[in-house]
Amino acid sequence: MFQFAKFSKSKERRLATELGYGFPIGDPWITDGISPWPFASESVLPSQCPGIHPMHSFRSCTQGTLNTTKISMKLTISDCGFEPLTEGFTVLHSTRATTCYHFLFNS
C-alpha cells in the first residue's frame, strides 16, 4: 500500500486531480501524498532516483489515450529566470508557489 492511497477519496486529492496534479506511484520521498509534479497522472512510473528526482521516465499522461511511449524528462529548479534551452529538448514552464520548475522533455 502506497502513501497516497489514504488520500484516494479525500477533498485534497480530488482538488489536486482537478488541477492537473499527479500522484507518482511508489515514491518514498512524498510524505503528504501529494505530488509536486504538475502535468503527470497516475501512469507515472516509479522513480529510480532518490531526493529531488533529476530524471524520470513517464508514460503518456493524456486522458483517454493508450499511448505508453516513454519520454525522458529533466527537471531544473531556478529563480524563474529562463535558462537557455538545451538543444533537442522542449521546455514546459510551470510556477508552483514560489518555485519555478522547468520541465525539459526530450524531443
Swiss-Prot record:
Keyword Mitochondrion tagged: yes
Key words of the record: Mitochondrion
GO cellular component: mitochondrion
Entry superkingdom: Eukaryota
Subcellular location, record wording: Mitochondrion
Major location (coarse): mitochondrion
Name recorded for this polypeptide: Uncharacterized mitochondrial protein AtMg00030
Organism from which the protein derives: Arabidopsis thaliana (Mouse-ear cress)
Lineage, highest ranks first: Eukaryota, Viridiplantae, Streptophyta, Embryophyta, Tracheophyta
